[in-house]
Amino acid sequence: MSKKNTADNHIVTNKKVFHDYFLEEHFEAGIALEGWEVKAVRAGRIQIKESYILVKDQQVYLFGALIHPLASASSHIFPEAQRTRKLLLHRYQIAKLIGASERDGYTLMPVSLYWKNGFVKVDVAIAKGKKEFDKRQVKKDQDWKKTQSRIMKAHKRQL
């Protein structure tokens, strides 16, 4: 039996996180979903752009994740698209996340969702907010790398 392509395991990525935060440490967390939510995630009807993670009572929760219900899968219940979802982590990981989130300027952000052995996993990152000048500096660096690659490409053509 061949191994599945890892690109197929990808569900969604929060691209805004890379622009607004410096990501320092990543954790893999499970997520407690209801049946209709799993079906909607399989259909790709999830959005984590405006979501964030908070710690309450020694438990970690995902807020603001929007899962649009499928009409066929959620006809017998009243689905709540933007409910709070519990993240499943080991106790030592929760302790590390609590310590990181209490530091000044740090927060917990969901980076991506993906499938692993049939379960939905969340990539949780300890993030530090970027200032406006940090964003400008990153943009300058990206522009310089693009220019540099163009120069190198043009130079190789001349040889």
UniProtKB/Swiss-Prot annotation:
Highest taxon of source: Bacteria
GO biological process, one term: trans-translation
Compartments it resides in: Cytoplasm
Pfam families: SmpB (PF01668)
Keyword annotations of the record: Cytoplasm, RNA-binding
Endpoints of the signal sequence: none
Listed GO MF terms: RNA binding
Family: Belongs to the SmpB family.
NCBIfam families: PRK05422.1 (NF003843), smpB (TIGR00086)
Protein name according to UniProt: SsrA-binding protein
